[in-house]
């Protein structure tokens, strides 16, 4: 039997006569959680966990911690220094008292004209587009990571920006002293965009089937922004069937939302898929504690019991 929970297929191997073995018998060993990835998750949790106020989350350091899932020995200092350097260049182009339009123009000149940052349209799903160190080095990114660079450079010159998580695209928003909003598209060289242009973008992505809603242009929290980066990366890894890397990413999502039943369940199923049975059953049982009346509770309970029985035979 092949079981599916939360969109993930659970493997069941066949015995010699062609019948199904026990659900978990296709795993011949219990694979422990990687210590290095566990350390990255702990470091990430210290930056973004529920104990941290959202506005105090350091987006630059949190994004570089995500990059440590791929580059475990990554030194943050050169990349933080690079952001400082970009900010100094932008500030040098500003008058003592700058209007928002002047600041946006200075940021756009430094990032896109002088430095040559651009959207990676040729290889949009390259995982490196989601790692801040790679984006700063290669000067290539996707909308959300280019927005993060733009946002962090702007912050360093005292120009506050907020993320806007429009479906299928990511923008930035600035509020002037009178509360008027300006939308900025970092993926398209810092262009200032209108609501009509946002609708045109949705029409391109969704073939005219998704009308622009006011909530699409609301500011998102820092946690939401980091979660979107992680979801992008998770989807890239799952599409490539690299479940081990997808698991490391979901571990970080759970660091942001440790009480999210769906994220805990998804981590359980990824742990199961890579043979981390003890971690899988612990997550499934935690999911049941958080969502005892979930529609799939019986199926999850049966799977957890099957794993417990399999583990007991190995002791």
What is each residue range found by the language model?
Residues 1-11:
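Extreme N-terminal basic, low-complexity initiation segments
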Residues 24-315:
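A structural boundary/capping signal
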Residues 5-6, 18, 35:
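Generic extreme N-terminus detector
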Residues 9, 13-16, 22, 26-27:
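Short, positively charged and aromatic/hydrophobic N-terminal segments
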């Amino acid at each position: 039997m092949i079981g599916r929970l939360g969109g993930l297929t659970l493997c069941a191997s066949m015995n010699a006569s062609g019948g199904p073995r026990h659900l978990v018998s296709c795993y011949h060993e219990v694979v422990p959680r990687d210590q290095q990835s566990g350390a990255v998750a702990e470091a990430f949790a210290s930056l973004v966990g529920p104990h941290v106020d959202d506005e105090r989350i350091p987006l630059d350091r949190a994004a570089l911690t995500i990059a440590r899932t791929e580059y475990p020995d990554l030194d943050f200092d050169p990349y933080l220094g690079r952001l400082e350097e970009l900010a100094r260049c932008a500030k040098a182009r500003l008058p003592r008292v700058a209007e928002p339009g002047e600041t946006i123009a200075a940021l756009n000149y430094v990032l896109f004209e002088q430095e040559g940052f651009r959207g990676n349209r040729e290889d949009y799903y390259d995982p490196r587009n989601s790692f801040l160190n790679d984006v700063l080095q290669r000067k290539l990114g996707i909308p959300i990571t280019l927005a993060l660079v733009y946002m962090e450079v702007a912050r360093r010159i005292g120009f506050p920006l907020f993320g806007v998580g429009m479906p299928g695209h990511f923008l930035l928003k600035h509020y002037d002293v009178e509360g008027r909003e300006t939308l900025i598209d970092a993926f398209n060289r810092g262009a200032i965009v209108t609501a009509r242009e946002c609708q045109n973008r949705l029409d391109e992505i969704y073939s005219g089937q998704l009308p622009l809603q006011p909530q699409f242009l609301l500011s998102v929290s820092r946690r939401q922004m980091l979660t979107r980066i992680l979801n992008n990366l998770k989807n890239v890894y799952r599409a490539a069937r690299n479940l081990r890397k997808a698991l490391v990413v979901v571990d970080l999502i759970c660091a942001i939302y440790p009480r999210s039943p769906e994220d805990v369940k998804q981590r359980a199923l990824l742990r199961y898929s890579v043979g981390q049975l003890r971690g899988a059953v612990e997550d499934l049982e935690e999911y049941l504690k958080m969502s005892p009346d979930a529609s799939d509770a019986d199926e999850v309970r049966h799977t957890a019991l099957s794993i417990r029985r399999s583990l007991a035979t190995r002791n």
